[in-house]
Amino acid sequence: MNSFMAIALIWMMIACAEADKPLRDPGMTGFQTCKDTLKLPVLEVLPGGGWDNLRNIDMGRVIDLTYTNCKTTEDGQYIIPDEVYTIPQKESNLEMNSEIRDSWVNYQSTTSFSINTELSLFSKVNGKFSTEFQRMKTLQVKDQAVTTRVQVRNRIYTVKNSPTSELSFGFTNALMDICDQLEKNQTKMATYLAELLVLNYGTHVITSVDAGAALVQEDHIRSSFLLDNQNSENTVTASAGIAFLNIVNFKVETDHTSQTLLTKSYLSNRTNSRVQSFGGIPFYPGITLETWQKGITNHLVAIDRAGLPLHFFIKPDKLPGLPGGLVKKLSKTVETAVRHYYTFNTHPGCTNVDSPNFNFQANMEDDSCDAKVTNFTFGGLYQECTELSGDALCQNLEQKNLLTGDFSCPSGYTPVHLLSQTHEEGYSRLECKKKCTLKIFCKTVCEDVFRVAKAQFRAYWCVATGQVPDNSGLLFGGLFTDKSINPMTNAQSCPAGYIPLNLFESLKVCVSLDYELGYKFSVPFGGFFSCIMGNPLVNSDTAKDIGAPSLKKCPGGFSQHLAVISDGCQVSYCVKAGIFTGGSLLPVRLPPYTKPPLMSQVATNTVIVTSSETARSWIKDPQTNQWKLGEPLELHKAMTVIHGDGNGMSGGEAAGVTLGVIIALGIVITLAIYSTRKYKKEKEYQEIEEQESLVGSFATDASPPNGEQDPCPA
């Protein structure tokens, strides 16, 4: 009987557990559950990720992806996230084309063409730091070659992102960190965090991808071969196509003799060749086009991408928990960080390889190819410094002009203010102070205290205001920093006979006064300019009138080069075009460019944001740090805490007074209770003593005298 009841009890417990079990276990949600349920592969080519449009690489995920509904493509072949939809290509889209790229300026990416042509930012440098582009440019310039590209493309799906998709958790948290700094008026820290956001999530967000596969052959042939066949570019592209089809064992029905001659001539002028397979099965020598195409299924990749800039997705509807005005400020901060990334990687110069002013490092034309060089005189430079707080920093920041021995320019020259910034250095020192208890028991306590020393430096260089005597200025021998080399020496050093002068925090400018021995190492100098100050040497009118705004560019015949990025400000210098252009292409300059403050300044804790447009107020909960739309009563309470009541008492003062009154009342009540209890105890003791004395006296009076008998015996 007992065993039967035990079995029944266990059965009831199992039944209850099954009844309470949810339809979908939250721990098992995701694409793995969908794969196990539907027995289908997951589509891996998805939009919603960050994209670096300079390097053409995928970055961190911006749009969140979930697989709650186990959606599939319309043809039922792949599992897709809830936030995307696909447009299947109902017909076969096998494309084959052949093209000539006679200049790297007209570069088009194989797998990122659409997003590289997006025009909202500096589109001229889109893709210019990708591996594909840098290989093409280097081979074209070094080998004096042109590029032919033959490709077969098979597009299976177009995958698009839903407009109602939410931002990913990591991206949202990064935005909230920036917002927190903006609320506290910590602009510099917010800029630093925005630059980190660009480093991690790129410049754009992919909104659409073409999923499929592509087989591409890129050849580099001598430019002379194209010139010899100038009237028949079709002949060159046909030769490239035949060479490609021979690789994939595709039979071409043309005249065998002419085909052989074309192919031999083409191959004899080929300096470099590469075949790439994007998607499908890996390419190998002897593979047929048919075999490669059959292997595309389950090997899909992105063969084209489209998208929008990162800040386009920072909108109030994507961040409903933040005030609209704060979201706009956040979006602008991120947009500025993206623009800095583009600006610091834009290298203006002559892009015509046939010009003597050609600049191999340039990625944007600046019309300097035909300009004539004007000789300018360099009047030196100097840097002033003012201590603001802490230890002495100016001894490493001050620099006197070599020509004057002072913080000034020579006669006939005028100073040009390049930049003013604040330099910070942290230091710690032992500080001791006396701590006392009840002003009697005292001891000396010592501890290491971290402090920040600050100094402001102001950098100047000297430009001639008119005609100056020959050999009166300084010779310029390049410059370098602790992170870059001097192109004149290919090292962090100056040429022989040159002296390094300090500028900004880490820049060393090489100069010389020796016109006999130092001249062979000098280069024609065309001035400096920065993010706040232009170059007065750009034209004669500006040079005569220093008070007029100067253009931030180099004079004709000079090319622009980066000197340093000083705490988010780019400083450039100009030398004769065609110089400092050798070597390999410059790598991309990644953010952050702004230095985070060593210690945060006194922050303003914003708790109320009022919009004049919508007449609504947002209140920040001090406990959760979350924003919410404020009700009238909550708004009144918040305003009372911030501004105090009508008598001018602040929230902190009111709280202090209240606490003091409570403590005082507590002390009074405690003393009253103690006094009452003490009084009661004393009264009780007094009553007991009186009773005892009465009993004693009564007993004495009742006892008979000695020798007398009781008159009433029993």
UniProtKB/Swiss-Prot annotation:
Job of this protein: Pore-forming protein involved in both innate and adaptive immunity. Plays a central role in antigen cross-presentation in dendritic cells by forming a pore in antigen-containing compartments, thereby promoting delivery of antigens for cross-presentation. Also involved in innate immune response following bacterial infection; shows antibacterial activity against a wide spectrum of Gram-positive, Gram-negative and acid-fast bacteria.
Protein's organism: Rattus norvegicus
Membrane topology: Multi-pass membrane protein
Activity regulation field: Forms arc- and ring-shaped pre-pores on top of the membrane at neutral to slightly acidic pH conditions and converts to pores upon acidification. Undergoes transition from the pre-pore to the pore in a processive clockwise hand-over-hand process. In the pore state, 2 alpha-helical regions refold into transmembrane hairpins (TMH1 and TMH2) in each protomer that form in the ensemble complex giant beta-barrel transmembrane pores.
Chain residue ranges for the region called P2: 410-653
Family: Belongs to the MPEG1 family.
Segment forming the signal sequence: 1-19
Any single biological process term in GO: defense response to bacterium
Record key words, sorted: Adaptive immunity, Cytoplasmic vesicle, Disulfide bond, Glycoprotein, Immunity, Innate immunity, Membrane, Signal, Transmembrane, Transmembrane beta strand, Transmembrane helix, Ubl conjugation
Keyword Cytoplasm: no
Marked site (Cleavage) residue numbers: N352, V353, N357, F358, N359, F360, K628, L629
Annotated region described as Disordered, given as residue ranges: 690-714
Subunit description: Homooligomer; predominantly forms a homooligomeric arc-shaped pore complex instead of complete rings of 16 subunits.
Domain MACPF: 30-345
Official protein name in the record: Macrophage-expressed gene 1 protein
Glycosylated residue positions: N185, N269, N375
Coiled coil: none
Free-text note on domains in this protein's UniProt record: The MACPF domain includes the central machinery of pore formation: acidification causes a significant structural rearrangement, leading to oligomerization and deployment of the transmembrane beta-strands (named TMH1 and TMH2) that enter the membrane as amphipathic beta-hairpins. The P2 region contains beta-hairpins to interact with target membranes.
Gene Ontology molecular-function annotations: pore-forming activity; wide pore channel activity
Compartments (UniProt record): Cytoplasmic vesicle membrane
A GO-annotated cellular component: endolysosome
